[in-house]
Curated annotation (Swiss-Prot):
<feature type="binding site">
    <location>
        <position position="209"/>
    </location>
    <ligand>
        <name>GTP</name>
    </ligand>
</feature>
<dbReference type="InterPro" id="IPR004161">
    <property type="entry name" value="EFTu-like_2"/>
</dbReference>
<dbReference type="Pfam" id="PF00009">
    <property type="entry name" value="GTP_EFTU"/>
</dbReference>
<dbReference type="Pfam" id="PF03144">
    <property type="entry name" value="GTP_EFTU_D2"/>
</dbReference>
<keyword id="KW-0809">Transit peptide</keyword>
<dbReference type="GO" id="GO:0003924">
    <property type="term" value="F:GTPase activity"/>
</dbReference>
<protein>
    <recommendedName>
        <fullName>Elongation factor Tu, mitochondrial</fullName>
        <ecNumber>3.6.5.3</ecNumber>
    </recommendedName>
</protein>
<keyword id="KW-0496">Mitochondrion</keyword>
<dbReference type="GO" id="GO:0000287">
    <property type="term" value="F:magnesium ion binding"/>
</dbReference>
<feature type="region of interest" description="G4">
    <location>
        <begin position="171"/>
        <end position="174"/>
    </location>
</feature>
<dbReference type="GO" id="GO:0005739">
    <property type="term" value="C:mitochondrion"/>
</dbReference>
<dbReference type="InterPro" id="IPR033720">
    <property type="entry name" value="EFTU_2"/>
</dbReference>
<dbReference type="GO" id="GO:0003746">
    <property type="term" value="F:translation elongation factor activity"/>
</dbReference>
<dbReference type="InterPro" id="IPR031157">
    <property type="entry name" value="G_TR_CS"/>
</dbReference>
<comment type="similarity">
    <text>Belongs to the TRAFAC class translation factor GTPase superfamily. Classic translation factor GTPase family. EF-Tu/EF-1A subfamily.</text>
</comment>
<keyword id="KW-0251">Elongation factor</keyword>
<dbReference type="InterPro" id="IPR027417">
    <property type="entry name" value="P-loop_NTPase"/>
</dbReference>
Length: 352
């Protein structure tokens, strides 16, 4: 049967950064309470992967929480507080996001998996890992600061890993003493977008305050701006093409064990589809393993079939926890090949 999965933040070592333009995958789920999912995932609208990027302390996690709060009013999300998203003790103590976190929500048109990426320069490798699977991203910029070092760096990295569509949220508008500064911030950001190769004229820029939305203050800057942002995401970020016809492939990012049940691997399905009961093959580190998928789950919900773009935990029979390592791949039997040569794009982190 399906397993119970809860989202969590996980440390992502640099060794996880994979080739093919750093198209890494984020460990989106870890095994939590060990019983069956009470709810089935309903695939009733297109699935899109998005995320928040931007400079440290510009409000990415606050905006993520605000989105879930606003959508919870219409049943489109489960409200997750800031503290629910920034779970790690060090993150709470320092007030910054270190590892990418993951939430889900739905608008009237789409289902979203949302990655909240860290903004601090020390954790840029985690930001790269969180951004690579995205179909589009939300660039969060504090109106009080304007463009900052990680604003530029995150936008550049997003472009390099293949994120082609961006929506801008100018946050903390309630804290600006002179409202005439807001158009200048927007102008500066459009110049940056053009410099990085994005369509500066057509990129939506929404001005608001995520904190106002969380605290039910100033509906125009708060709740209304979040709804405006969601509308911009719905319309500006196109539906991605999902490669569901080719053989199933899932890069493994997390490995867990449920005593008496089996081994769980987590990751984002890169192509194809897999169903409960399917046989699969795992390769990597010189090993070839066989297993059977006995359960699939996403965001606390069981699903009979996972498709390209889905963030899943798969329960496997026939494997021990110590047999599988992060960095291996799972796929359709006979469809995987080992390679010794690759092309990679390398981003060298500097002390600055």
């Amino acid at each position: 049967g399906p397993l119970r999965v809860r989202t969590s933040k996980m440390a992502l070592p640099a060794a996880l950064l994979r080739a093919a333009a750093l198209r890494c995958r984020l460990p989106l789920a870890s095994v939590g309470r060990r019983h069956l999912a009470a709810e089935a995932f309903v695939r009733d609208r297109p699935h899109v992967n998005v995320g928040t990027i931007g400079h440290v302390d510009h409000g990415k996690t606050t905006l993520t929480a605000a989105i879930t709060k606003v959508l919870s009013e219409s049943g489109g999300a489960r409200f997750q507080r800031y503290e629910d998203i920034d779970k790690a003790p060090e993150e709470r103590a320092r007030g910054i996001t270190i590892n990418a976190a993951h939430v889900e929500y739905s608008t009237a048109r789409r289902h979203y998996a949302h990655t909240d990426c860290p903004g601090h320069a020390d954790y840029v490798k985690n930001m790269i890992t969180g951004t690579a699977p995205l179909d589009g991203c939300i660039l969060v910029v504090a109106a009080t600061d304007g463009q900052m070092p990680q604003t530029r760096e995150h936008l550049l990295l997003a472009r390099q890993v293949g994120v082609r569509h961006v929506v801008v949220y100018v946050n903390k508008a309630d804290a600006v003493s002179d409202a005439e500064l807001l158009p200048l911030v927007e102008l500066e950001l459009r110049e940056l977008l053009a410099e990085m190769g994005y369509d500066a004229e057509r990129t939506p820029v929404v001005v608001g305050s995520a904190l106002c939305a969380l605290q039910d203050r100033d509906p125009t800057l708060g709740r209304d701006s979040v709804l405006q942002l969601l509308e911009a995401i719905d319309t500006h970020i196109p539906l991605p093409h999902r490669d569901v016809q080719r053989p199933f492939l899932l890069p493994i990012e997390g490995v867990h064990s449920i005593p008496g049940r089996g081994t769980v691997v987590t990751g984002t399905v890169e192509r194809g589809a897999v169903s409960k009961g399917d046989e699969c093959e795992l390769r990597g580190y010189g090993r070839v393993l066989k297993a059977v998928v006995t359960g699939l789950e996403t965001f606390h919900k069981s699903l009979p079939r996972a498709e390209a773009g889905d963030n899943v935990g798969a329960l496997l029979r026939g494997l021990r926890r110590e047999d599988v390592r992060r960095g291996m791949v799972m796929g359709q039997p006979g469809a995987l090949r080992d390679h010794r040569k690759l092309q990679a794009q390398v981003y060298v982190l500097s002390a600055q």
